[in-house]
């Protein structure tokens, strides 16, 4: 995609305010991509829960914060030639978790007891850790490897031929 205009929201990178001011997804295509969200900077911060109170801003629950399409805006990307260079959410759609109704947030932002802001009450909150391929705990067990020799007995100085199979253990 073309470079964002100087001083635009697209230059802010990932931040609390950027994500929590997304109020809608706008995409004419089958999948959201290339930052196709609508951002409304201001006093209202959006999220997945009702009843959240803050002395600094208003809050509003939006269903998109519990849907994989929210993540697709940044994790699906086409280059200027129409070629997918990132298709994370599209791959998720083709995988088992989509079919089971498990959105990205359930694994990459697991809920745990804590606070989502310093002035908030303790509650079960989405951890903003975004665990993924950079997290050894997430990667462990993602692929199951099975090896089967073609022959059960091999001479000591012989060559063994193995059939290797890889299975998706838990990758989205």
Which residues does each PLM region occupy?
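Primarily the internal scaffold of c-type cytochrome electron-transfer domains
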Residues: 2-172
